[in-house]
Amino acid sequence: VPTMFSRMLKLSEKEKYMYDLSSHKYAIHGAAPCPEKVKHQMIDWWGPIIYEYYGATEAFGFAYCNTQEWLDHPGTVGKIVSGELAVLDDNMKELPLGEPGTLWFKPTSEFEYFNDSERTSEAYSEDKKLTTVWDVGYTDSDGYLYLTDRKTFMIISGGVNIYPQECEDLLIPHPKVFDAAVFGVPNDDLGEEVKAVIQPIEGIAGDEKLTNELLDYLSQHLSRQKIPRSIDYIDKIPRLPTGKLYKRLLRDKYWGRDSSKIIKQ
């Protein structure tokens, strides 16, 4: 997963080049979109051997690209090579090229989530002809797919739709950040505000100085409403065994949905 790339890139130059990589012919990654900066750095290091894919067991679709395709279409997760994709708005109307919407696929068979009929129902369109895992993205004129974020992670702050992945993609490659998560937390005036939770690199203190440095860095790349209102620090960002970010565990603490105490205030 891209997180592994980010962590490897933070190795010292000596550690990066102490092994003979001549037998390393292929590197395949998926599970989450890779920040463009990270992908470029990995290609510079390993060469044109990196392949990317996108797919979900439930969604009946699969996208793929090799290194050159990605360089020609930076940020893509690949071209759909299996399945029928539709990019739709909230009214189930097809969107034009380049405009983000929910990704829906035509199922080839039925599926259901174990002991979760509500989630199963939400994954299907009303006519049962399409299914989704609520990823948001768009396609370009060449048919390449780009992911924006998960719809369930979208932050609505003061009527503005904010996708946290954009901020995460900037934070994770930062030299003082080992891992990061960005999500919405309650705000009485705005509905939600942007929160960042950071796992600093070992030896780096999660203090006001680092917070100011990170916010200043983000302000050079993001519009004001996309910048976190606050940053908390944590010993370890929770991830699933696959490397996927366990964002719900972090969000639930702030929304009062469990008694998690994993965040250091």
Predicted feature descriptions by range:
Residues Y51-T57, V77-K79, F183-P186, D232:
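Beta-strand->loop->alpha-helix junctions that form or flank phosphate-binding loops
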Residues Y26-H29, V182, D232-Y233:
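Hydrophobic/anchoring residues in structured secondary elements
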Residues N91-E94, F105-P107, F111-E112, R119-K129, ...:
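AMP-binding/adenylate-forming catalytic core of the ANL superfamily
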Residues D252-Q265:
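Acidic/polar alpha-helix N-cap and adjacent early helical turns
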Residues L21-H24, S82, V177, Q199, ...:
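Core-facing hydrophobic residues within beta-strands of well-ordered domains
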Residues A86-V87, Y138, P238:
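Hydrophobic beta-strand positions
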Residues L9-H73, E84-A86, N91-E94, S109:
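Gly/Ser/Thr-rich phosphate-binding loop
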Residues Q220-K244, I263-Q265:
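AMP-binding/adenylate-forming catalytic domain of the ANL superfamily
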